[in-house]
C-alpha cells in the first residue's frame, strides 16, 4: 500500500482548513449576533453570496414624487387574478428596449386593458368549450369509436380532435336527416373516421414528436398587435407592453438655458427619452415638454437614426440628438437621447395614448450599457465619466406614505434605512438581477429547483411570479373581504414570504405585500413570465418591495461584479 507523504498530508489539510475557514467567513455574515464581512474583505462575493456594504454617505439627493393615474385603483390587479383562476392564462413580457422601459414588448396590452383582456379570454374559453362539447357529442354518437378516441386523448394534440368534431357534427346532422339509412351510414362513418383518425394521428405525431412545454412555445411567438394568443393546448397567452402602473419621477434639467422635465428613473432600461414641443397631439400637451429650439447646446444627431416605437394601440416617433443635462448638482454634457415628436393612436375604438396612461415627460434609464440603443454611452456612465468624484452607485428610498421618496446619486443616506445593507452580486450586466436560491410562502417552498433570479426594477409597481408558481401562490395567499377597520386582524393569519439568497433571507410580511381595494385584501403580485436563458424571473417592484426595503445599486469594477444592496427601510420618513 502506497504511503502518503507528510508534505501531501499537510497540503490536503491546508486546503481543507482554507475551504472551511472561507465558508465560515462567508456564512457568518448572516449569523445572529455576529457582524457581516465588509465587501472589501470578501474576496469572492459569489462564494459568499454577498457581503456587507461599506457605507458611503452622499448629499446628492433627488426628491421623487409618485405619478399615478389613479392612486387608489388596484382593480386591474384584481381582474388579473380573476383571469388566472382556471389556470389556463399566461401573461408575459419580452426583454426588449422601449419607450416604456425594457421589460415589455412593442405590441400587446397594458395593465389598464384588463377588462378587454378578460373579455377576449372568456370569448376564447367559450369557443373552446363549444368545440369540446361538439367533440363529446361526436364521440357519444359514434359508440364503436368512443373508447378508441378516449385512449388517444393523452397522445394527440387537441386541435386534431376539434377538427374531427366539426366533421362529426356535419355527419351527425346528415345522419339524422337520413334515418332510413342510419345504420349503413353509421358504419360507413365509423370506418371513414377510423381511417382518417389513424392517418391524422400518425401525421400529428410525426409533426409533434417534440412536444415541448408551453413555456418554450410562447417565447417563440411573434406578436402582431394581438391581444390574446391561443395555443393548441388552449392556453391563452397575453403579451404585455410593459408593467407600468405607478412611476416615481424627479426633476431633470435639459438644455441651455435649462428646461425642467420630470422623467421616470428606471433601473429596468438604459436609454434616455424626453417629450418635445414638436409633439402636438393632445395627449402630449398634457405633459411638460422640452423645446430643443430654445437650447443653445442642443445638436441633432448626424446619424440617420430615428425614434419609432410601435405599440398595440398606436406609435410614437421622433429623432435622436444631444444636449446638456443636469441631475441635481451633476452636469452631463453631450448626452445622446431620444426626442419624442409625435404620437398616433391606431385604436379604432378610441382609448388612451401612451401619455394618457403613463403621463410621463421622459425616462432616464439606469440599467447597463448592454441595453443601450441610442448613443454610445448611457446617462449614468456619462455622469460618472464627467464627474470623477462621484462613486459609481445610486440608491432608492420609496416612502410608504408617498412622502419623501428619494434617488441618491453616489452613495446612500443613513436616514432612510436601519440595520445593515447586504450586497448581492449581479449575475449578468443587463438588468439588475441576482440569483434566487429559494422562495417560501410560510413553510411551503415553491422555488427554486431550476436556476432562478430576481430583477430589481424601479419601473415596475407590483412584484411578480412566473406562471409555474402563480397557481400555488394564489392557493396559499388568496384575496379576501376586508375593511379599513379589520384588515390588520385578518392579515394576522397570512404567511410570511421569504426570498432566500444564500444565507440571506428577506422577509415580506402580510401588511407589506397585501393591498386593500374596495373592501378586498389581495396580494400585490402579478403572474408574469420573462423569457430568459436563466429560467424563472421574479420581479421586485417599487410599490410592493421598495417601499419596505432601501435598495442600493453599485456598478462593478474589473475585480468585482456589480451588486444590489438591500436593507430594511425606515417607515417614519
UniProtKB/Swiss-Prot annotation:
Autocleaved into a p16 prodomain form and two mature forms p44 and p51. The record marks 131-132, 220-221 as: Cleavage. Inhibited by small molecule 49c. Inhibited by small molecules WM382, WM4, and WM5. GO terms for molecular function: aspartic-type endopeptidase activity. The keyword Ribosomal protein does not apply. Its EC number is 3.4.23.-. Residues 1-26 form the signal peptide. It is an enzyme of class 3 (hydrolase). GO terms for biological process: entry into host cell by a symbiont-containing vacuole; protein autoprocessing; protein processing; proteolysis. Disulfide bonds join 39-51, 42-48, 279-284, 447-448, 482-521. One of its GO terms (cellular component) is transport vesicle. The active site is at 266, 457. Residues 183-203 have a biased composition (Acidic residues). InterPro entries: Aspartic_peptidase_A1, Aspartic_peptidase_AS, Pepsin-like_dom, PEPTIDASE_A1, Peptidase_aspartic_dom_sf. Active at pH 5.5. Residues 167-211 are annotated as: Disordered. Residues 27-221 form a propeptide. Glycans are attached at residue 334. Its main location: cytoplasm. During the asexual blood stage, processes key proteins essential for merozoite egress and invasion of host erythrocytes. Cleaves and activates proteases SUB1 and SUB2. May process members of the EBL and Rh protein families. Also cleaves apical membrane protein AMA1. During the mosquito vector stage and probably in ookinetes, cleaves CelTOS. This is Plasmepsin X. It comes from Plasmodium falciparum (isolate 3D7).
Amino acid at each position: 500500500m502506497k504511503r502518503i507523504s507528510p508534505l501531501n498530508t499537510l497540503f490536503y489539510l491546508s486546503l481543507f482548513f482554507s475551504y472551511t475557514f472561507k465558508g465560515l467567513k462567508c456564512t457568518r455574515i448572516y449569523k445572529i449576533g455576529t457582524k457581516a464581512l465588509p465587501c472589501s474583505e470578501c474576496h469572492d462575493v459569489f462564494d459568499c453570496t454577498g457581503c456587507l456594504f461599506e457605507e458611503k454617505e452622499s448629499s446628492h439627493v433627488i426628491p421623487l414624487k409618485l405619478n399615478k393615474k389613479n392612486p387608489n385603483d388596484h382593480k386591474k390587479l384584481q381582474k388579473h387574478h380573476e383571469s388566472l383562476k382556471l389556470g389556463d392564462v399566461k401573461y408575459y413580457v419580452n426583454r426588449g428596449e422601449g419607450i416604456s422601459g425594457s421589460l415589455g414588448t412593442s405590441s400587446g396590452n397594458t395593465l389598464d386593458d384588463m377588462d378587454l383582456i378578460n373579455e377576449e379570454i372568456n370569448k376564447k374559453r367559450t369557443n373552446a368549450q363549444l368545440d369540446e362539447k361538439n367533440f363529446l357529442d361526436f364521440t357519444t354518437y359514434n359508440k364503436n369509436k368512443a373508447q378508441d378516441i378516449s385512449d388517444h386523448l393523452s397522445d394527440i394534440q387537441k386541435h386534431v380532435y376539434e377538427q374531427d368534431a366539426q366533421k362529426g357534427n356535419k355527419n351527425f346532422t346528415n345522419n339524422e336527416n337520413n334515418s332510413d339509412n342510419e345504420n349503413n351510414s353509421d358504419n360507413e362513418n365509423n370506418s371513414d373516421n377510423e381511417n382518417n383518425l389513424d392517418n391524422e394521428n400518425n401525421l400529428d405525431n410525426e409533426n409533434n414528436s417534440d412536444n415541448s412545454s408551453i413555456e418554450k412555445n410562447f417565447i417563440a411567438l411573434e406578436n402582431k398587435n394581438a391581444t390574446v394568443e391561443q395555443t393548441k393546448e388552449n392556453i391563452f397567452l397575453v403579451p404585455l407592453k410593459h408593467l407600468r402602473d405607478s412611476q416615481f419621477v424627479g426633476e431633470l434639467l435639459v438644455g441651455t438655458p435649462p428646461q425642467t422635465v420630470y422623467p421616470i428613473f428606471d433601473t429596468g432600461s438604459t436609454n434616455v427619452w424626453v417629450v418635445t414641443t414638436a409633439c402636438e397631439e393632445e395627449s402630449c400637451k398634457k405633459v411638460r415638454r422640452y423645446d430643443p429650439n430654445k437650447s443653445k447646446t442642443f445638436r441633432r444627431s448626424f446619424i440617420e437614426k430615428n425614434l419609432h416605437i410601435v405599440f398595440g394601440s398606436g406609435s410614437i416617433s421622433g429623432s435622436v440628438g444631444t444636449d446638456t443635462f443636469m441631475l441635481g448638482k451633476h452636469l452631463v454634457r453631450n448626452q445622446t437621447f431620444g426626442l419624442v415628436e409625435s404620437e398616433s393612436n391606431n385604436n379604432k375604438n378610441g382609448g388612451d395614448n401612451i401619455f394618457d396612461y403613463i403621463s410621463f415627460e421622459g425616462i432616464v434609464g439606469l440599467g447597463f450599457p448592454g441595453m443601450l440603443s441610442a448613443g454610445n454611452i448611457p446617462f449614468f456612465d456619462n455622469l460618472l465619466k464627467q464627474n470623477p468624484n462621484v462613486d459609481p452607485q445610486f440608491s432608492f428610498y420609496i416612502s410608504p406614505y408617498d412622502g419623501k421618496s428619494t434617488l441618491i446619486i453616489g452613495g446612500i443616506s443613513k436616514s432612510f434605512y436601519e440595520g445593515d445593507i447586504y450586497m448581492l452580486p449581479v449575475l449578468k450586466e443587463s438588468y439588475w438581477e441576482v440569483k434566487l436560491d429559494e422562495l417560501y410562502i410560510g413553510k411551503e417552498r415553491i422555488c427554486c429547483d431550476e436556476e432562478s433570479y430576481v430583477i430589481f426594477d424601479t419601473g415596475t409597481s407590483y412584484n411578480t411570479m412566473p406562471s409555474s408558481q402563480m397557481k400555488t401562490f394564489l392557493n396559499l395567499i388568496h384575496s379576501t373581504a376586508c375593511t379599513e377597520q379589520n384588515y390588520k386582524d385578518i392579515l394576522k393569519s397570512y404567511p410570511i414570504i421569504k426570498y432566500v439568497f444564500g444565507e440571506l433571507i428577506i422577509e415580506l410580511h402580510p401588511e407589506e405585500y397585501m393591498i386593500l381595494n374596495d373592501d378586498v385584501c389581495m396580494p400585490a403580485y402579478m403572474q408574469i413570465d420573462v423569457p430568459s436563458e436563466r429560467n424563472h424571473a421574479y420581479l421586485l417592484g417599487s410599490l410592493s418591495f421598495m417601499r419596505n426595503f432601501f435598495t442600493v445599486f453599485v456598478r462593478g469594477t474589473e475585480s468585482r461584479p456589480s451588486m444590489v444592496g438591500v436593507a430594511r427601510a425606515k417607515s417614519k420618513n
